[in-house]
């Protein structure tokens, strides 16, 4: 009995009419059974109709793999209606990861060779969609012939198919290189767009092609100039802009050809200025062309005035009502802040206004750019804006904002008092979101500023009395009260509001910290130690302190219990030594000195900081990488691995004698740190070399050098690094993203790693790149670094 089969339109209506998912599955299962039966009967007139219904079922997410062989039969059919559905089914149902797709190679070859343009177009579309590297190598000669066909319809599709072939197998570049120059002379916009895309792909994957196509820069400039000066055309204009797609693609190609090549850059400078000044910005099409123009100007050797014009265009984008355009402007300015810092500074006020954006992505990008714009001349004004933003910013931005403010204050603080005030404000506003080393840095800073001890202890005492919920603030205040409690009681500070503090008030405040449920065990440890130190600084009876300390002798926290037992023993057995043991901490040399940009600035507050050479401003978002979950705890020392390390240099007896006499001595230059090869695969090698500046012992400069000895280029190379949480990592921009084959110019990238605790260093690296047409990703840990990198 013949079962009536639904038409495609009827099947769609019936599926859409299903009220439940179960009804939909029932309809589809019933129809799939009829489709299978029709395939078994082998009716050639119904095959393409049945496959069309099966493709619709596949689009809904239901299995349709049993139709793969029917696709092959339809492709081999001489009828165009069969081929059309067969090729569509092949693009949807066949996968280059399975060998079944290779069965259509011969059919595609035959269709490409015949003169039927619609059939050739179907074959080219299928090949460019799911053609594997093997298919591309077999069919490249046929596609090359079609590049010179008189029909623009076929040539457009052949050009785009060639782009796919080069992506799958870069070795095919030599086949498609010669026809490009001739194709570029075509006046058909579709052919021009495809040709520019093909040349771009060739230049990105083949250095020889890059050198070859630099000769056509004048031709590209002329094409773009014609587009800019041409009036309105109904065929090509979009929102009043003449073919913006072709303009954008030409600008991208010019950016590649002009990078690191002065002659090509000079050829396109005038044109870029013309595009930047004449493009209409009232519609998105014009904004897209302007953005590509700006990126091209900044990537090539352009004139200084042209670069300023590009930054001003981005500044106008910041005032646009479209949030997407503002986000693009902030992102582009963040990329340009390294090369044109002064030009970006002109738009600082507009960038700061973007901090108040309601969109989280915009405010985050504005925060990163604002932190990157901080320098010694604007640090006071910028810190006021950032501190105001910190008070009202969303919780997910508070940690980044607080960390960025602390880092900027560390580098550009105009005075120690200003630095202390800034950190105190951050701890008071967002103490729970600061880095782990903020407490240690502030205590060290206060310890160094002897003239600010009274000011600091009184400020911290007042802040602690108002709020004990911010744990970092409580820890710093407890430490400072313990060290300088005598100044709190006796000292007078003109820079703070006068108030009288009694011994009972100080002890009661520390007891409140100990009893608070919000206090962490570490905070209670600070408070107990502060009480012990106050026992030698206060003139009253110490019985109250002894009673409080003795309570924690039975604490469930082992650290607090041990500390309390030791302090009780100090009271009972070594009371005569207590004053000497609990005296003020000596000054500790800072491992990360203040770095500040050159230039004179008036110092109106206490103790100006020393001015040193500037460090490059980096986006703060890349400075702070919390990688605890990637590397785990790093408290234990790591194995040194297989690298050959040099022993540390021991001082000579004469040098030791000079140190004993406290005479000035110039330290000998440090021994060079041996480099380490951390990665090697298929001709790609990654070596790390190290340097520790004498003036900043806690800073390690790591230079990652990547070389390629294979026979094929490595493209789209990206190296990312991660460090444990106790370190601070700053990744500088790499020298490029393409490594030429057979020992070409390597890629170098510098990592700035700050290790204030001198902990054993280990890295986690992730490499992503394309090699032999295949994407590669490698993730590995490096734990064989020389001991000289941290000791």
Curated annotation (Swiss-Prot):
Subcellular location as annotated: Golgi apparatus membrane; Cytoplasmic vesicle membrane; Endosome membrane
Keyword Mitochondrion part of the UniProt annotation: no
Keywords per UniProt: Cytoplasmic vesicle, Endosome, Golgi apparatus, Membrane, Protein transport, Transport
Tissue-by-tissue expression: Widely expressed.
Gene Ontology CC entries for this record: AP-1 adaptor complex; endosome membrane; Golgi membrane; Golgi-associated vesicle; membrane; synapse; trans-Golgi network; transport vesicle
Membrane topology: Peripheral membrane protein
One GO biological process term: intracellular protein transport
Residues annotated as domain GAE: 671-786
PANTHER family found in the cross-reference section: ADAPTIN, ALPHA/GAMMA/EPSILON
Functional summary from the UniProt entry: May function in protein sorting in late endosomes or multivesucular bodies (MVBs). Involved in MVB-assisted maturation of hepatitis B virus (HBV).
Family: Belongs to the adaptor complexes large subunit family.
Subunit structure: May interact with AP1S1/Sigma1A-adaptin and AP1S2/Sigma1B-adaptin. Probably does not interact with APB1. Interacts (via GAE domain) with RABEP1, NECAP1, CLINT1 and AFTPH/aftiphilin. Interacts with HBV major surface antigen L. Interacts with HBV core protein C in a ubiquitin-dependent manner. Binds ubiquitin.
Entry protein name: AP-1 complex subunit gamma-like 2
Annotated source species: Mus musculus
């Amino acid at each position: 009995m013949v079962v009536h089969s639904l038409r495609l339109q009827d099947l769609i209506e019936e599926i859409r009419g299903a009220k439940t998912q179960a009804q939909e599955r029932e309809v589809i299962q019933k129809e799939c059974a009829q489709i299978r039966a029709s395939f078994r009967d082998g009716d050639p007139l119904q095959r393409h109709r049945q496959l069309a219904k099966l493709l619709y079922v596949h689009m809904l997410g239901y299995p349709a793999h049993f139709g793969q062989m029917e696709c092959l039969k339809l492709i081999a059919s001489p009828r165009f209606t069969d081929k059309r559905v067969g090729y569509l089914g092949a693009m949807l149902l066949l996968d280059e990861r399975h060998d079944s797709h290779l069965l259509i190679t011969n059919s595609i070859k035959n269709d490409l060779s015949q003169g039927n343009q619609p059939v050739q177009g179907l074959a080219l579309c299928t090949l460019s969609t799911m053609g594997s590297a093997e298919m591309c190598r077999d069919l490249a000669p046929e596609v090359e012939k079609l590049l010179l066909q008189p029909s623009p319809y076929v040539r457009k599709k052949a050009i785009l198919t060639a782009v796919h072939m080069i992506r799958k197998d870069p070795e095919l570049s030599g086949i498609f290189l010669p026809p490009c120059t001739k194709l570029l002379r075509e006046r058909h916009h579709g052919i021009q767009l495809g040709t520019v895309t093909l040349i771009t792909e060739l230049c990105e994957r083949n250095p020889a092609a890059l050198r070859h196509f630099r000769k056509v820069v004048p031709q590209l400039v002329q094409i773009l100039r014609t587009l800019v000066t041409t009036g309105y055309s109904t065929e090509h204009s979009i929102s009043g802009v003449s073919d913006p797609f072709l303009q954008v693609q030409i600008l991208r190609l010019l950016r590649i050809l002009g990078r690191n090549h002065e002659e090509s850059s000079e050829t396109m400078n005038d044109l870029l200025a013309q595009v930047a000044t004449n493009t209409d910005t009232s519609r998105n099409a014009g904004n897209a062309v302007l953005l590509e123009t700006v990126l091209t100007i900044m990537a090539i050797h352009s004139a200084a005035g042209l670069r300023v014009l590009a930054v001003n265009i981005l500044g106008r984008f910041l005032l646009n009502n479209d949030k997407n355009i503002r986000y693009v402007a902030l992102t582009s300015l963040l990329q340009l802040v390294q090369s044109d810092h002064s030009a970006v500074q002109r738009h600082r006020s507009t960038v700061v206004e973007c901090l108040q954006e309601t969109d989280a992505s915009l405010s985050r990008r504005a925060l990163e750019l604002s932190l990157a714009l901080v320098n010694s001349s604007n640090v006071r004004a910028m810190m006021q804006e950032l501190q105001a933003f910190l008070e009202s910013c969303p919780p997910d931005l508070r940690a980044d904002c607080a960390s960025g403010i602390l880092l900027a204050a560390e580098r550009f603080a105009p005075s120690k008092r200003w630095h202390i005030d800034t950190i105190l404000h951050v701890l008071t506003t967002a103490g729970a979101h600061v880095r782990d080393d903020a407490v240690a840095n502030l205590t060290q800073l206060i310890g160094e500023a002897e003239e600010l001890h009274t000011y600091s202890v009184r400020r911290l005492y007042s802040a602690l009395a108002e709020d004990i919920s911010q744990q970092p603030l409580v820890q710093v205040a407890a430490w400072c009260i313990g060290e300088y409690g005598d100044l709190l009681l006796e000292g007078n500070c003109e820079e703070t509001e006068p108030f009288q503090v009694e011994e009972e008030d100080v002890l009661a405040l520390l007891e409140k910290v100990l009893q608070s449920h919000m206090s962490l065990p570490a905070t209670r440890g600070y408070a107990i130690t502060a009480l012990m130190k106050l026992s030698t600084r206060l003139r009253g009876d110490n019985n109250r302190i002894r009673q409080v300390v003795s309570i924690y002798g039975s604490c469930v926290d082992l650290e607090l219990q041990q500390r309390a037992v030791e302090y009780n023993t100090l009271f009972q057995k070594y009371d005569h030594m207590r004053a000497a043991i609990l005296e003020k901490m000596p000054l500790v040399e800072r491992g990360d000195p203040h770095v500040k940009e050159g230039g004179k600035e008036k110092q109106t507050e206490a103790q100006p900081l020393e001015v040193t050479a500037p460090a490059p401003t980096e986006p703060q978002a890349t400075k702070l990488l919390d990688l605890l979950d990637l590397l785990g705890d790093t408290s234990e020392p790591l194995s040194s691995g297989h690298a050959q390390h040099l022993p540390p240099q021991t001082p000579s007896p004469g040098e030791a004698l000079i140190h004993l006499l406290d005479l000035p001595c110039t330290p000998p230059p440090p021994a060079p740190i041996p480099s380490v090869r951390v990665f090697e695969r298929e001709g790609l090698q990654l070596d790390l070399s190290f340097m520790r500046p004498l003036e900043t012992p806690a800073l390690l400069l790591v230079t990652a050098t990547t070389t390629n000895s294979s026979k094929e280029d490595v493209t789209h190379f990206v190296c990312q690094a991660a460090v444990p949480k106790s370190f601070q990592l700053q990744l500088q921009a790499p020298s490029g993203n393409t490594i030429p084959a057979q020992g070409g110019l390597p890629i170098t990238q510098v990592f700035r790693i700050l290790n204030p605790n001198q902990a054993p260093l280990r890295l986690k690296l992730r490499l992503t790149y394309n090699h032999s047409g295949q994407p590669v990703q490698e993730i590995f840990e490096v734990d064989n670094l020389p001991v000289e990198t941290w000791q």
